[in-house]
Amino acid sequence: MMCPLWRLLIFLGLLALPLAPHKQPWPGLAQAHRDNKSTLARIIAQGLIKHNAESRIQNIHFGDRLNASAQVAPGLVGWLISGRKHQQQQESSINITNIQLDCGGIQISFHKEWFSANISLEFDLELRPSFDNNIVKMCAHMSIVVEFWLEKDEFGRRDLVIGKCDAEPSSVHVAILTEAIPPKMNQFLYNLKENLQKVLPHMVESQVCPLIGEILGQLDVKLLKSLIEQEAAHEPTHHETSQPSACQAGESPS
């Protein structure tokens, strides 16, 4: 009785062997879907690099925009610039340096025929006050989110529509890195930090969002449709989470 049982087990084992290679394409398809997502992210990243997004951000000028902001306390920049009477002709400056555009971390989200791209960037700020010889170092972090989708026209053809592009409010952080701050500057720097958090997102959006619109406008609709079909077929459930950056973890002087 044992012999037929072993023969049956061996026979079933042999039947299972040809099935093994057929299981391989499924992980491959899942990987291809992830590759498609990263391909779309790479297209956006390469476009931002090609259009010198970092240089555009670095060339942002602050003085007029800070003073013109309705949220800025009256005379803030004027006080910053004048400081002392004998330095009235010397302007203070805020320069952007060390821009880190996280092209490798661009996240693409799908829902039916709707897409969302999340682009994280971080940079340093150097404040040179006219009333003080010390340079105050700060850093800023934010995530730009752009939405785009496929929409049918009156003839049933799909067109790419680009929606809102702005900084996610909860992602905007400005931190003061310099530790040796004179006590007389604490309140001023606190106000400046609050004002920068209000105006920086709009200033960065004005440089980055037009570039993203141009990049997305060149995408092939068939490619996007293919990505949507892949998403509908596999519906990945994992979500990547990023660790807080050094700037996000930074603290302002008390």
Swiss-Prot record:
Stretch forming the signal peptide: 1-21
Region annotated Disordered, chain positions: 233-254
Record flagged with keyword Glycoprotein: yes
One MF annotation (Gene Ontology) recorded for this entry: lipid binding
Glycosylated position list: N36
Keyword terms of this UniProt record: Disulfide bond, Glycoprotein, Secreted, Signal
Pfam families, alphabetized: LBP_BPI_CETP (PF01273)
Disulphide-bonded residues: C165-C209
Superkingdom: Eukaryota
Subcellular location: Secreted
Primary residence: secreted
Cited InterPro entries: Bactericidal_perm-incr_a/b_dom (IPR017943), Bpifa3 (IPR032946), Lipid-bd_serum_glycop_N (IPR017942)
GO cellular component terms listed in the entry, alphabetical order: extracellular region
Biased composition (Polar residues): 242-254
Family to which this protein belongs: Belongs to the BPI/LBP/Plunc superfamily. Plunc family.
Protein's name according to its UniProt entry: BPI fold-containing family A member 3
